[in-house]
Amino acid sequence: MKLPVAVLVACAATVTASPSFADAKSEAKSQVEFGINVAQRGLWREAIYRWQKATELDPSYAAAYNDLAIAYEHEGQLDKARKAYEKAIELDPNNTQVRQNYELFKEINDRTTKAKEK
């Protein structure tokens, strides 16, 4: 049985307007802020945990993926960093900060790779 598009749109609007959705977005923001706080103190693994949690709570939160990418990069988890940057850009393609972070990440990794090949 096919549902009319209007019904599907109405259902989606109801879900996104529900308190649980709003609560998840709010909790995701809290997790990102907490992650920033602990990262500033050098607790990168805790920051990664918090930002992963934020992306689970709100999979559309581009800033959480950007922060997660930075933490992965700091911890030397470069494949994970690349994937997180790409996800952040996919979610927010016009975010110049994310794009700059990703371009710098690629530039540094390209230089490192070339240096290792010599």
Give the predicted meaning of each segment.
Residues 28-29, 62-63, 96-97:
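Helix-start (N-cap) detector for alpha-helical repeat units in TPR-like alpha-solenoids
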Residues 40-41, 74, 104-111:
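Register position in tetratricopeptide repeats
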Residues 53-56, 89-90:
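Conserved structural position within tetratricopeptide repeats
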